[in-house]
């Protein structure tokens, strides 16, 4: 075994290269903080499942990412959050969607995995399950910020479902690349080759109430097995159609591709250009973070000393 490794993301999309410093720096700082948190946890011997949950919780608590506190609004001005988590060794997994009051959806997804015979709970039943297990909840107004109200207003004015960090067009007001559609995720592997993946999001601005994206769909936005762990981000419908996360693992399992080869093939060939990015680690400590969008907020580190925090290609 090569050793531990970790990778995380804060969303992929059309992130303009001239993203203002006041939008860029807080996100880069958050990625650095979360990466350091994950590294410390892995070095202290925490299982990858704990590490992935810990990092995603921290990302959910950061208002500049579209998950937890920063979740964007539906067409009706409400929040509907979703998340999933998976353990590679056992293939146990949990997923939730339609959450309106849960502070950390990723932790509720883990409770579904550990406390029920099921994989997926949604909407009122998931909220009731959260209350029954003492999960931290708040009034839904906690998530409805002035910034997200403004984003929804803009999306409605132009009759669109707002996609990831959309580059403004001449008919669309300049949003500084801050459409706040960044799914968050983390994958981790320890020195024994144990793997885990976790992903969380608020979805699209102006999405239909009840819409479910790729994030809570095991095999689409999240997957882990004995070979690798993957967390995807981007346009959910395309990621679901491409079964992105599972396809990376399948190419490794059935075709013998390396993690980097498998992930690159899926991102380049299985989904439309401009629709997807992912972070992934393998059981031997390999890390890859490909994307076919303008940029992806991402960070990684491995036991051999390599680390990276980046947004655009080659930066």
UniProtKB/Swiss-Prot annotation:
Binding residues for substrate: 211-214, 233-236
Top EC class of this enzyme: hydrolase
Record-level GO BP terms: proteolysis
InterPro entries in UniProt: Ntn_hydrolases_N, Peptidase_T2
UniProtKB keywords: Autocatalytic cleavage, Hydrolase, Phosphoprotein, Protease
Modified residues (Phosphoserine): 169
Residues with site note (Cleavage): 182-183
Protein's UniProt keywords contain Cytoplasm: no
One of the record's GO cellular component terms: plasma membrane
GO molecular function, one term: beta-aspartyl-peptidase activity
Enzyme Commission number(s) of this protein: 3.4.19.5
Active site: 183
Family recorded in the similarity comment: Belongs to the Ntn-hydrolase family.
PANTHER family per record: L-ASPARAGINASE, N(4)-(BETA-N-ACETYLGLUCOSAMINYL)-L-ASPARAGINASE
Protein name: Isoaspartyl peptidase/L-asparaginase 1
Organism of origin: Arabidopsis thaliana
